[in-house]
From Swiss-Prot:
Keywords tagged on the record: Cytoplasm, Protein biosynthesis
Gene name per UniProt: frr
A single GO BP: translational termination
Family per record: Belongs to the RRF family.
Transmembrane segments: none
InterPro entries: Ribosome_recyc_fac, Ribosome_recyc_fac_dom, RRF_sf
Keyword Cytoplasm carried by entry: yes
A Pfam family matched in the record: RRF
Organism for this UniProt entry: Clostridium botulinum (strain Okra / Type B1)
Main localisation: cytoplasm
Entry-linked NCBIfam families: frr
Subcellular location: Cytoplasm
GO function terms (MF aspect): ribosomal large subunit binding
Gene Ontology CC terms, in alphabetical order: cytoplasm
Name by which UniProt lists this protein: Ribosome-recycling factor
Amino acid sequence: MIKEILKKADEKMGKTIVALKRELASMKAGRANPAMLDRIEAEYYGSMTPLNQLGNISVPEARVLLIQPWDKSALSAIEKAILKSDLGLNPSNDGTVIRLVIPELTEETRKNIVKTVKKTGEEAKVAIRSIRRDCNDDVKNLKKDDVSEDDIKKAEDDIQKKTDKYIKEIDSIISAKEKEILSI
């Protein structure tokens, strides 16, 4: 029973790290990255469809994203979706492809992005601590099942070690992203 709780903690904490990495990948860092467009959806034949399912997204130059839709009729919908997004990019539609030029980041913009990165990191840490609390509650409930105090204490220590490991990983991911943003 304790092993299952520890496994559940590991899985949930791992998913939190994956979600954090995905979230950070979509943040602008002054260079083109197709992941920036992952959360943008365009209306296509009546339903909202992610841009990466509407066409090919490539990076021909360091600060240029090129979107080649498989269906040319989707060009205007893709353009509207990009304009509505919070990325602040101006799409250039030439009738066959959409070009997105990623502007140079100002110092102020960089600092704002770093603040957002730190906030996102803190949210991930809160999620990890919440998972720790839930797992510790599950372990404490095992007292009813005649599990020894020593086993419960050891399980709580193991959960704390996992928590510390994942929080340390979050810190390193956040500091790497900050360096990436500030060094460009």
